[in-house]
Amino acid sequence: MHQLVLLRHGESVWNKENLFTGWTDVELSPRGEEESRNAGLLLKEHGFVFDLAFTSLLKRAIKTLWIVLEQMDLMWIPEHKEWRLNERHYGALQGLNKAQTAQEYGDEQVKLWRRSYKVRPPALAEGDQRHPSFDPRYHSLSRDLLPDTECLQDTVERVLPFWQQQAVPALQQGKRILIAAHGNSLRGLIKYLDQIPDDDIVGLEIPTGSPLVYELDRDLKPVRRYYLETGKAG
């Protein structure tokens, strides 16, 4: 049996302020730090140990991982930062208040941008300093890999090469893996693992700071999945 734990980062300051975040690199809120500590303690209390960890290039996920590993006394294990685990890019909506955006564009339009599988929000304008091409952490990547906006389908397609090229080989070697990432990048992994239809995955809610445990068979097919806090199926 192979062990995989997925963890959405703790609450960020922009989660708290109800702003579209995407690839904007914001801090954890005090509540998010506490959620991360609790997740680490919970994993430790239940006897979980990891050989390898993955996270995104965004500090709310990185710090969540660090806090969890510190609580588990596992700061020494290898960790890999993968841009493909970044949150969905919300384009020109990044930094805008969700409620105010709904007032300006209408609830239905914003709902489409947020919750449809294939509809992208407005893209960043050419030359917008928020574009990842201006960020040094992405300078090693080809320009055509960097999004100016994404729908959920784009995010899923971005995440799957990470799964096939990084996670699968490690799991096949018997590594126990923790992935600390974001709501939409984790949706991509969950959609693939559980074979969830396009129309259903958009409504899947993933709580912040709650470890989602997968027990996988030799073919890496889920045998059991549950949130550690409750023991109930996710």
Swiss-Prot record:
It catalyses: (2R)-2-phosphoglycerate = (2R)-3-phosphoglycerate. Keywords: Gluconeogenesis, Glycolysis, Isomerase. Pathway: Carbohydrate degradation; glycolysis; pyruvate from D-glyceraldehyde 3-phosphate: step 3/5. Substrate binds at residues 8-15, 21-22, 60, 87-90, 98, 114-115, 183-184. The keyword Magnesium does not apply. The active site is at H9 (tele-phosphohistidine intermediate), E87 (proton donor/acceptor). The record marks H182 as: Transition state stabilizer. Belongs to the phosphoglycerate mutase family. BPG-dependent PGAM subfamily. Catalyzes the interconversion of 2-phosphoglycerate and 3-phosphoglycerate. Homodimer. This is 2,3-bisphosphoglycerate-dependent phosphoglycerate mutase. It comes from Citrifermentans bemidjiense (strain ATCC BAA-1014 / DSM 16622 / JCM 12645 / Bem).
